[in-house]
Amino acid sequence: MRNPVFISILLMVLIAIDFYIYQVLKHLLQGSGAGIRTAVRLLYWTLCIICLGAILLFPYFTNPYFRQYIFSISMGWMITQLVMALVFLIDDIRRGTFWAVGKISNASGAQFLNTENGIPRSTFLSWLGVGLASSLFISLIYGFGNKYNYRIVKKSISLKGLPAVFKGFKIIHISDIHSGSLQDKMAVQKGIDLIKAQNPDLVLFTGDLVNDRATEMQNWMDVFSQVKAPHGVFSTLGNHDYGDYVKWDTKEAKQQNLNDLMQVHANLGWRLLMNENVKIEKEGAHFHLVGIENWSAKARFPKYGKLEDAMSGINANLPIILLSHDPSHWEAEVIPKYPEVQLMLSGHTHGMQFGLENPYFKWSPVQWVYKQWAGMYQTEKQQLYVNRGFGFLGYPGRVGILPEITLIELV
C-alpha cells in the first residue's frame, strides 16, 4: 500500500518544479512566434500531466506492458525535469550572487548579469539545461527501439592448461533474459536465431530467467527451448529468480515458485547448476564448469551461493569456468579465495541499459555501483566477463548499451 503523505508531498514538489521550469521556458521563448510558443506549451504540459497522472493512477494499470511504458516515460520525464531544474537553479544562484555583490558594492546588479560580448550567460545556461534535458529524454524514447537489437560480441579467451582438443571450442554466453518483460516473440526469435547461427559447442546462461515468477516463462518455452548445443546448455540462478521481490501468501508458495522455475530449466533442456560442478568432456579430455546460486557483495542482494560446496572434488590443475550471476562476487570471494578459477562469467548489471560505448571508451552510471559492469576484466591469472544482458528490466529499452549474445572462443 502506498503512503498517501509521501505521494502528496511528491506531487507538490513535482508541480512546483513544473511551474519553475515553465517560467524559465516562457522567458526563453519570448522572441519566438506564437505557433512555436503554443506548441511548446502544449507539449510541456501534456508530459507534465502524464507524469503526474501516472503517479496517481499507476496501481490501477493492470496491463504489464502498458505499465512498463508509462513508468518509463514518466521516470524519463521526471529525470529530464530534474536536469533542467538543476541547471536553471545553478544559473539563478549565480544571478542572485551577482545581485547581492552588486548591492553590497553599491554597483548596479545588472552589470554583473551579462557578458561583455554575445549571448548573456544566463540565457546560455538556460538553453544548455533545455538542450541536455531534451537530449536525454529523446534518447530514452529512441531507446525503446533498441530493446531487441541483439548484437554478437566475440571474445577469444585463453585458459592455462586447456586440453588441445578444446582449442577453437565455441561457447555462447547469455544472461538476464527477464522473460516477464519480453513482449515481441518475433523479435526475440531473431535473437535465438543469432545464437543458433553461431553453432556453439556449449551454451551458458548466468541467471535471471524471470523477473519474479516462474509463470512468466509459460509463453516463451517454445522459443528458448530452441537453444541447444552438442555439449549442453548449463544455467544458474540470478537474484530475480528466487521471487524475493514478491509478497507471497506463504513461505511454501515462494518455495513452490522456485521449484517450478527449476522445473522450467529442466523442461527447456537446460542443466541448472545449484552450487555444483560438472565436467565438460571431449575426446577423453575435460575442463570443469562450476555454477553457483546468486552471491552478491552488495548487502541488498542475496548470498545463496556456496562456492566451497560447488568446488568440491575439482582438479585444480585443469581449467575452471565459474557461472556466478553477480560480478561483485569476483573481487569479494573468487579472487581472494579461489585463484584456481581462471574464468568467471556473470551478468546482472545490464550495463544499466544506458550509457556510451565504442571500441575506445565505455561509460554508464552503473559503474558508480559496480566496478566490473560490462565486458572483460582480468588480473594476472584470473578473468571475468560481464554480459550486458539479453533482456531488459524496468525501462523497456536500451540507450548505448545493446542486448548482448557473447561468443567465446577458447584458444
Where are these regions (language model features)?
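Non-catalytic terminal accessory segments
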Residues: 1-148
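Arginine residue identity/basic-tract feature
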Residues: 2, 37, 41, 67, ...
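Short, charge-rich amphipathic segments
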Residues: 17-30, 116-131, 154-163, 189-203, ...
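Acidic, His/Gly-rich catalytic cores of divalent-metal-dependent hydrolytic chemistry
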Residues: 18-23, 31, 52-66, 149, ...
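C-terminal segment of N-terminal export signals and the immediately downstream linker at the start
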Residues: 101-104, 135-172, 182-186, 190-193
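A short, flexible N-terminal coil/short beta segment enriched in small residues
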Residues: 119, 125-128, 136-155, 256-275
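Soluble catalytic domains of enzymes that build or remodel membrane lipids, polysaccharides, and related
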Residues: 162-411
